[in-house]
Amino acid sequence: MTTSTIDIGGKTVNRLGYGAMRITGQGVWGPPKDHDEAIRVLRRAVELGVTFIDTADSYGPYVSEDLIREALHDGSGYGDVVIATKGGLTRSGPNVWPPLGRPEYLRQCILMSMRRLGVEQIDLWQLHRIDPNTPREETFGEIKTFLDEGLAKQFGLSEVTVEEIEAAKAAGLPIAAVQNMYNVGNRSAEDVVDYCDAHGITFIPWFPVNAGKLANPGGPLDEVAKQHDGATTSQLALAWLLRRSPVIAPIPGTSSVAHLEENMKAEELELSDDEFQTLADAA
């Protein structure tokens, strides 16, 4: 089995985590259609061994963080579970996500996330997007200030280039994690993955099971699945990511307990060298 742990937020966690975007309403706006199922999903994830959950203040907005606290906070914290969150986006409607990197807004983001999650320090706080309309030195400067104040144990970036990672490091920010879209079907962030691998930075791929045409009937994922006793294409997509690099920590999301249980079985899959390369080449 692929080595399944990684250090995030000062704790050793299982690499196959859970992304808590889909426990909100349609368009990642408002409450979930089934509140009780959302709570069940979160609790079942932990029962299945998930110790890394990723969310953001913009999911809902605020809904995902509130649900995580309701489902998992034990009165003093989250035990062995690392809760990562993000800030730096505003919401003006379903599927609308304008970035805002003003220092005062980012400080509000992290302070309000701390309040909603019921913690005195965020395990991993990530800048959801770099705002092109705010000077980077202002954004990075404020983040460094609240990191120095101890508001977060670790810091990460989302949807960034290698150049932007280097710029953040040059501004004095210790980069513990990078979260970009990346999956077996979309490898546009390959250079960022390689950079993270070389520098020991956790890489968190979002949309990890979105394999595109590779998952079509008769496609590469489908053909490999036939060699693994009915494994699903989603499970294979996750297994491929876990094999791709030891710094990768996928965060598949779902609002269904059944789908969650299916995804978690990906850790049991072991791709052969030929299978891994077949899928790598197919993209």
Kindly give the residue locations of the regions a language model identified:
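A short acidic, helix-capping loop that chelates divalent metal ions and anchors anionic groups
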Residues: 24-28, 90-96, 215, 259-262
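Active-site groove signature of glycoside hydrolases
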Residues: 114-133
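Alpha-helix N-cap and loop-to-helix initiation/capping positions
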Residues: 30-37, 63, 67, 97-108, ...
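N-terminal binding-site loop/beta-alpha segment at the start of enzyme catalytic domains
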Residues: 1-81
